[in-house]
Amino acid sequence: MKKLFFLLLSFFIFFGCQKTTTPPNILFIMSDDHAYQAISAYGHGLNETPNIDRIAKEGALFKKGFVTNSICAPSRAVMLTGKHSFINGKVDNIQDYNWDQDNFAKQLQTVGYQTAMVGKIHLRGLPQGFDYSAVLPGQGHYYNPDFLIDGIKKRIEGYVTTITTKLSLDWLK
């Protein structure tokens, strides 16, 4: 009887201890052309950014970042690919970007993540590696902008930051 009890106890302990962790959520926010003191999480008082501060406190706050290419589209290509501009081929804001190359979103998809890109991308072509995309073609407009939503052009009434925030939150839900 003791052997049976020990066997059953071992069985429940073994199967009760299985790994049940889920991968962490990743929210990557990239902003253009702001000074280091524009986000209050970095300890400067220029702007109060309580929501970004909360995200930084609960997640990660990068305090030592280095830019390999500080030009708009090339910097995005570097972020997507992890490769210097002279390797990923996007060295200026004019030439096309090769979406066929590997990027971090494609890698995240291979391990089960759902991926989305919302906002200004400034890379020609349709984003690849994303389950959902709502991007501004080119520079975009601040009011009543056209978006490419999963490749379909749609004009949305309103201010671009408000629209981008809403599209992002709708997808996250």
Name the predicted role of every residue range.
Residues 2-4, 17-173:
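Formylglycine-dependent sulfatase
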